[in-house]
Amino acid sequence: TEPIRLWRNLDTMQLTGAIKAEYDECQEKPVEIFVDAIGLGAGVADRLREMGLPAYAINVSESPAMGQHYLNLRAELWYKAKNWLEGRDVKLPNDDRLKSELVTVRYTYTSSGRVKIESKAELKKRGVASPDSADAFVLTFASDAGTAIGGRSSRRMGKIRRAIAGIV
């Protein structure tokens, strides 16, 4: 598998340019590019779409697609990734950072029985850095979150618009 590429300390346009260059180099173009919409990512997703890339801004703090089971979309995506990893013979990139981050983040249940993923503030209290690689990995399950409960999709002006919270 190819190594994971990380970009740090880039502004919105520099990050957009790096993603566009990566996209242009791909022999097999991604069908969807999911971008964390919190902070810098919202502008990145907007610009990528403007350039014609299939980019979607994901706000993981919003409600999950399967609201009764998860506290928020972040919890839903992390839990879907967990189940996917446990349920299949998978091959992750040979990246120690990603593997470490995936097993570091903990989950619990709320008093109402919803899955809750450890917050960045809780991780920081434990002395754990932000799991950036793992967060990017679990964003790849955003498409599945919409289809898991039959999330509606419609094509308008060449763009896919999903009718679920958190996916723009």
Question: Which residues does each predicted region cover?
Answer:
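Mg2+-dependent endonuclease catalytic cores in nucleic-acid-processing enzymes, primarily RNase H-like
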Residues: 1-114, 156-168
